[in-house]
Regions:
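Short, conserved beta-strand element in jelly-roll/cupin
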Residues: 35, 46-62, 147-150, 159-174
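Ordered, small/hydrophobic-rich secondary-structure cores
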Residues: 1-85
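A short, N-terminal "cap"/entry segment at the start of jelly-roll beta-barrel domains
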Residues: 1-30, 74-75, 94-96, 101-141
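Conserved short histidine dyad/triad with adjacent acidic residue
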Residues: 16-19, 30-47, 129-132, 143-160, ...
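Ligand-binding loop in jelly-roll beta-barrel domains
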Residues: 83-107, 194-215
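Short acidic-glycine-tyrosine-enriched beta hairpin
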Residues: 67-83, 178-195
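A cytosolic small-molecule/anion-sensing beta-strand core signal
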Residues: 56-57, 93, 169-170, 185-186, ...
Length: 215
């Protein structure tokens, strides 16, 4: 896998087909990339565990609960569905998204509204001269966190305690990884492995989400 990629590149839309691809992040948190062709759907079903959805490309409508409440969903959106809740989806145009199944009990930030679609980049603000962090959901095996880097800020090289994927939400940054620099822009992703030495340097203001799976 290329270090810089998009979910759509890994799982492109195919007409008339629903396709899933295991992200191979680990066993404690299932991470899957999905693509649905235009005019396709997934019937309502429910997981016993919390499910998190992150939009990568295209538009879809999620059908939540016994009444199949409709929730519009697009690029950069996030939807968290509690365990035991019916959830399905349909798309007229085609869509690509990431699904996370959090198998263990978790702690969720109080600002998060389960069952409601949220724009990830709008959940966190820039703080002058600072790096802001906001934990969305976490447990002892995973963490999904938002970060906002003000201009001129960055993280010095450090090693990851697990496999991780960055979702660039706004702006641009330079990602240093094992001695090489990569440019990451909004809409792109970056994958690094457990114990991979990495850094983040904002090129202007930069927002990202980070999924870390510790095993």
């Amino acid at each position: 896998m290329n270090r810089v990629f998009t979910i759509e590149q890994l799982r492109p839309i195919k007409d008339g087909m629903t396709i899933s691809r295991d992200a191979k992040m680990g066993t404690s948190t299932g991470v899957t990339f999905f693509s649905l062709g235009k005019d396709t759907s997934i019937s309502q079903e429910c997981y016993d565990a919390t499910a998190v959805y992150i939009g990568a490309k295209g538009d879809a409508t999620f059908l939540i609960g016994e009444n199949a409440d409709k929730k519009n969903f697009t690029e950069g959106d996030c939807l968290i569905v509690p365990g035991g809740t019916l959830c399905g989806m349909e798309t007229a145009t085609g869509t690509v998204y990431t699904e996370m199944i959090i198998k263990k009990e978790n702690t969720m930030n109080n600002i998060i509204k389960s069952g409601e679609v949220m724009k990830l980049k709008d959940l966190i603000s820039y703080e002058e001269g600072s790096i802001a962090n906001l934990d969305v959901v976490s447990n002892d095996t995973m963490k999904f966190v938002l970060m906002a880097f003000d201009e001129g800020t960055g993280l010095t090289p450090h090693r990851a305690p697990g496999n991780a994927i960055i979702f660039a939400l706004e702006g641009k940054a330079t990602i240093g990884y094992e001695g090489k620099d990569y440019t990451l822009s909004a809409g792109e992703n970056f994958r690094f492995d457990k114990n991979g030495l990495h850094s983040v340097t904002a090129e202007g203001k930069f927002k990202m989400a980070l999924l870390l799976v510790r095993e």
